Amino acid sequence: MADKIKDAKIVFVVGGPGSGKGTQCEKIVEKYGYTHLSSGDLLRAEVASGSERGKQLQAIMQKGELVPLDTVLDMIKDAMIAKADVSKGYLIDGYPREVKQGEEFEKKIGAPALLLYIDAKAETMVQRLMKRGQTSGRSDDNEETIKKRLDLYYKATEPVIAYYETRGIVRKINSELPVDEVFAIVVKAIDELK
């Protein structure tokens, strides 16, 4: 089964909570027929299912802690295999959060062709998340939790970006720009993969 995904185009999408990476991923799916896999969405779906694993995950997430690496990786791999026949490529959103995760991903699944680093200022991300929290009802969208998530994000992500920069596959995208301008830059990066 895993052979099916061996030659697929894999794009890591990294960006803080509220950076706009979800929006950009939607646009990529629409234009390129990629499968968008968000580790956060996969985790939330597992929690919503009420399974035993879901209950354990919920307890971890409510504390604002990171979910164990193997759990996330298994969920991503299962989801990739499930979509292998219909997918033109994969957007792996919100992963890897640390270098070790990236290394494990490559061992078990494959190497990324590109890392899109969707970057916005910290205050922009806080504002966007506060606004989203008013409408989403997501329990992790309150200011204290948001700041904690951003701190965790920066600490974890900087080494990841540096690690992939040494391979020359990182494209830093300024997501302070209007959505369509951001997407134009994203398109350029993906088109270079062909």
From Swiss-Prot:
Residues that, per the record, bind AMP: S39, R44, E65, L66, V67, G94, Y95, P96, R97, Q101, R138, R149
Main location as per UniProt: cytoplasm
Domain notes for this protein: Consists of three domains, a large central CORE domain and two small peripheral domains, NMPbind and LID, which undergo movements during catalysis. The LID domain closes over the site of phosphoryl transfer upon ATP binding. Assembling and dissambling the active center during each catalytic cycle provides an effective means to prevent ATP hydrolysis.
Modified residues (N-acetylalanine): A2
EC number: 2.7.4.3, 2.7.4.4, 2.7.4.6
Positions with a binding annotation for ATP: G18, S19, G20, K21, G22, T23, R132, L177
Family of the protein in this entry: Belongs to the adenylate kinase family. AK1 subfamily.
Species per Swiss-Prot/TrEMBL record: Cyprinus carpio
The protein, known as: Adenylate kinase isoenzyme 1
Role summary: Catalyzes the reversible transfer of the terminal phosphate group between ATP and AMP. Also displays broad nucleoside diphosphate kinase activity. Plays an important role in cellular energy homeostasis and in adenine nucleotide metabolism. Also catalyzes at a very low rate the synthesis of thiamine triphosphate (ThTP) from thiamine diphosphate (ThDP) and ADP.
